[in-house]
Amino acid sequence: MKVDKIDKQILAILQKDGRVSASNIATELEISIPTVTDRIKKLQDSGIIKGIHAVLDPKPLGLDVAAIITLISESSFHYKEVTEAAEKMPEVLQCLTTTGKGSHMLFIVTRNSASLEDLLRTIQSWPGVQRTE
């Protein structure tokens, strides 16, 4: 799918507020509501819009510790396994493959320092993970 200026404007609006109505988008961009809904559907069908998610404040949920964990792998052989393991953990908000010193960076939230230690032990037991930093 070719993304044009209008599509990019719609995406920018949705990134700020995923719950904004098609009517409000249409008014802001001075286009019709059916045009907005058709374009959003095409953006979803093409996979450009993968979903609309709530951004949560972790503290009221009892998640008081946020951390960035760098994983040092034995080799690139385990990259896929590490990524798949990270995606299964609810504490992991994001898993990035990196170059340089580490193989992956994990952005996590957890309850407290004790649960962080438990999480680190779990991650260090994954195949190919040499250590965490």
Where would I find each of the regions flagged by the language model?
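A compositional/biophysical signature of low hydrophobicity enriched in polar/charged and small residues
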Residues: 1-133
